[in-house]
C-alpha cells in the first residue's frame, strides 16, 4: 500500500490534482492508519466534489481515527445528505450504522 501512496503523491507533486487522486490518497492513508494525512486529502477531494458521499464516509473514519468524534459525526451527516440526494442506498445504510455507533458510545458515556 505504501508503494501506491508514493506513486499517487508523485503524481500530485507533478501537478496532477483532482478529486479521484485526492480521494485515492485519502483512502490509502486511512487504510494505513495515517489519519491526519488522510483527512487532508479527503477534504481536498471534497473541495472538488462536495456531493461525493464515499469521500465523506472515509473523512469520518479519518476524523474518528484521530479521536475527533464530533468531526466524524459531522462528516458522516454530510455524507448521509449527499448519499440520499444521489440515491446511493448502500452508503446511506453504512453511514446510518456509523452514526448509530457514535450515538451508542455517547449514551454509554464513551
Predicted regions and their residues:
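Canonical positions in the second alpha-helix
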Residues: 11, 44-45, 79
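Structural marker of alpha-solenoid helical repeat scaffolds
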Residues: 14, 48, 65, 82-86
